[in-house]
Amino acid sequence: VVLGPASDGRNAAANNKASDLIRQICCGYGDCGFVPNVCV
């Protein structure tokens, strides 16, 4: 993760990408106790 105001957009994009991947894995395999409501 890159820190600083100039990198906020990149961090948001990376976080969104990670969230999408987590959501796919969790919703596909149903093994996501560490991420509440990930499939909502």
Swiss-Prot record:
<feature type="disulfide bond">
    <location>
        <begin position="27"/>
        <end position="39"/>
    </location>
</feature>
<protein>
    <recommendedName>
        <fullName>Alpha-conotoxin-like Lp1.6b</fullName>
    </recommendedName>
</protein>
<keyword id="KW-1015">Disulfide bond</keyword>
<keyword id="KW-0027">Amidation</keyword>
<keyword id="KW-0964">Secreted</keyword>
<dbReference type="GO" id="GO:0099106">
    <property type="term" value="F:ion channel regulator activity"/>
</dbReference>
<dbReference type="GO" id="GO:0005576">
    <property type="term" value="C:extracellular region"/>
</dbReference>
<comment type="function">
    <text>Alpha-conotoxins act on postsynaptic membranes, they bind to the nicotinic acetylcholine receptors (nAChR) and thus inhibit them.</text>
</comment>
<keyword id="KW-0629">Postsynaptic neurotoxin</keyword>
<dbReference type="Pfam" id="PF07365">
    <property type="entry name" value="Toxin_8"/>
</dbReference>
<dbReference type="GO" id="GO:0030550">
    <property type="term" value="F:acetylcholine receptor inhibitor activity"/>
</dbReference>
<feature type="propeptide">
    <location>
        <begin position="1"/>
        <end position="23"/>
    </location>
</feature>
<feature type="disulfide bond">
    <location>
        <begin position="26"/>
        <end position="32"/>
    </location>
</feature>
<dbReference type="GO" id="GO:0035792">
    <property type="term" value="C:host cell postsynaptic membrane"/>
</dbReference>
<keyword id="KW-0008">Acetylcholine receptor inhibiting toxin</keyword>
<dbReference type="GO" id="GO:0090729">
    <property type="term" value="F:toxin activity"/>
</dbReference>
<keyword id="KW-0800">Toxin</keyword>
<keyword id="KW-0528">Neurotoxin</keyword>
<comment type="similarity">
    <text>Belongs to the conotoxin A superfamily.</text>
</comment>
<feature type="modified residue" description="Pyrrolidone carboxylic acid">
    <location>
        <position position="24"/>
    </location>
</feature>
<keyword id="KW-0872">Ion channel impairing toxin</keyword>
<dbReference type="InterPro" id="IPR009958">
    <property type="entry name" value="Conotoxin_a-typ"/>
</dbReference>
<keyword id="KW-0873">Pyrrolidone carboxylic acid</keyword>
